[in-house]
UniProtKB/Swiss-Prot annotation:
Phylogenetic placement of the source organism: Eukaryota, Viridiplantae, Streptophyta, Embryophyta, Tracheophyta
Record-given protein name: Tryptamine benzoyltransferase 2
Function of the protein: Hydroxycinnamoyl transferase that catalyzes the transfer of an acyl from benzoyl-CoA to tryptamine, to produce benzoyl tryptamine. Serotonin and tyramine serve as acyl acceptors in vitro. Specific for benzoyl-CoA as acyl donor. Has no activity with p-coumaroyl-CoA, caffeoyl-CoA, or feruloyl-CoA as acyl donors.
GO molecular function: acyltransferase activity, transferring groups other than amino-acyl groups; hydroxycinnamoyltransferase activity
Active site: 155, 386
Family to which the UniProt record says this protein belongs: Belongs to the plant acyltransferase family.
Pfam family for this entry, one: Transferase
Keyword terms of this UniProt record: Acyltransferase, Transferase
Main enzyme class: transferase
EC number: 2.3.1.-
């Protein structure tokens, strides 16, 4: 791997400046609850792939349509409602641009696809997010003329829905070239966090999305763990396998629900947990349609909260797929308009009191056992990531530095297959690989 160039790519010029030019946009309640990390995505394209110049020009046009992607995270000092001067995190919309690296590899793309390893194929996340480009891209050319597009985006700026919208806009800009035109997305992030008057939180968000003060261990069992003791593995569930899971659930069931139910069962079994322990899954829920009133579908930013289906280990491992899916659905249903408004009100009250809120999201190197966290990319429109020569040949697994974190990715061309990428403790990963294709619903390890 050789990095051949590094440059800051400015947005393409527009006829009129966008309305947020130069603004310091405060992070919303949803931004502040999100991971304070860069999130990687890696797309592989077989030859013939578009030129790097075409990909970069498309990126310039996409960033012009999404100007927040060209900004920088910063700390600002402003007066609160009581007239007190307080530090706050902001996104400075300064058009400094996206960082773009060019790289070459003296190898064929097929070798990378066979290994499904994305190491070094996306920019290394900076140690500090303040002042760094919130969007960073690496274009890696292979000996066979294949191309890998690896990017990292900061989660305080992009949630998964926003990342999908941005990436598909970028691909369209590459395809359309000078003819590219796209309506501006909704950039008014503040509409997500309007409190009631007076604010009236009714749920205990301090134990769910936030902690007051510095982050510390919580009921999820998160504890420090050396990243080198975490193994990243990937397994593929074919469309036929997913159909069998759905048949076992019966009735209407989404791919996400049935695969999550299966993965929760098998990972819990692989971990060898005690029967009386409880295990839960942190499930990201897009709140755009669930809020009251709903937010625009094209809102660019964060608008995600989490559901927490929770079961005792003995019950989880003995339950039918139908029952486990029911527990997942019930937890997700609780993230409704009232819950979302309560969350917004809670942050407003905490800010008025001068409380420092720390997100409960896990940090790199932590272990979630006995719990899990799932991030679904099943709604990502990967087929629209066509840069003009066809959709990606593969979406490669990024490094997952948190034990118990899993990502669900649709399999291109499989008509319903799912790739599951998961990070598990070294001594548990092999066990999971041995049992992950078993469809025994009520199998309980002998020690339970």
């Amino acid at each position: 791997m050789e990095i051949t160039s590094s440059a800051m790519l400015k947005p393409a010029p527009t006829p009129t400046p966008h309305p947020l030019a130069g603004e310091k946009v405060p992070l919303t309640a949803f931004d502040r609850a999100a991971f304070d990390v860069f999130v990687p995505m890696v797309f592989a394209y077989r030859a013939p792939a578009p030129s790097s110049e075409a990909v970069k020009e498309g990126l310039r046009m996409a960033v012009a349509a999404y100007p927040l992607a060209a900004g920088r995270l910063a700390v600002d000092v402003a007066a609160d409602g009581q007239g007190r001067r307080r530090r706050r995190r902001v996104l400075h919309v300064n058009d400094e641009g996206a960082l773009v690296l060019d790289a070459t590899v003296e190898a064929d793309l097929d070798a990378v696809l066979a290994a499904n390893v994305a190491t070094d194929l996306y920019p290394a996340p900076p140690e500090h997010s303040f002042g760094a480009a919130v969007l960073q891209v690496q274009l890696t050319r292979f000996r066979c003329s294949g191309l890998v597009v690896g990017l990292i985006v900061h989660h305080h700026v992009f949630d998964g829905h926003s990342t999908s919208a941005f990436c598909t806009t970028w691909a369209r800009a590459v395809r359309d070239g000078e003819a590219f035109s796209v309506p501006s997305p909704c950039l008014d992030r503040a509409i997500t966090s309007v409190p009631r008057s007076p604010p009236a939180p009714v749920f205990d968000h301090r134990s769910i999305e936030f902690k007051v003060g510095n982050k510390s261990s919580d009921s999820s069992g998160a504890a420090a763990a050396a990243v080198e003791k975490i193994t990243n593995i990937g397994v593929r569930f074919t469309a036929k396998f997913v159909a069998e899971l759905k048949a076992r659930v019966g009735g209407r069931c989404s791919t996400f629900e049935c695969v999550l139910a299966h993965a929760w069962k098998k990972m819990t079994a692989a971990r060898g947990l005690k029967p009386e322990e409880f295990t839960r899954v942190r499930v990201a829920v897009n709140c755009r349609r669930r809020a009251n009133p709903p937010a625009p579908a094209d809102l660019f930013g964060n608008m995600v909260l989490w559901a927490f289906p929770r079961l005792q280990v003995r019950r989880l491992l003995s339950a039918s797929y139908r029952d486990v899916v029911g527990a997942i659905r019930a937890a997700v249903a609780r993230v409704d308009g009232e819950y979302i408004q309560s969350f917004v009100d809670y942050v407003e009250v905490a800010d008025a009191r001068g409380e420092e809120l720390a997100a409960t999201a896990a940090e790199p190197g932590e272990t979630l056992c006995p719990d899990l966290e799932v991030d679904s990319w099943l709604g990502f429109r990967f087929h629209e990531m066509d840069l003009g020569t066809g959709p990606p040949a593969a979406v490669l697994s990024p490094d997952l530095p948190i034990e118990g974190l899993m990502i669900l990715v649709p399999v291109g061309g499989d008509g319903g297959g799912v790739d599951l990428f998961v990070a598990l403790a070294d001594d548990r990963a092999q066990v999971f690989e041995q049992i992950c294709y078993s469809l025994e619903e009520h199998a309980i390890p002998s020690h339970l």
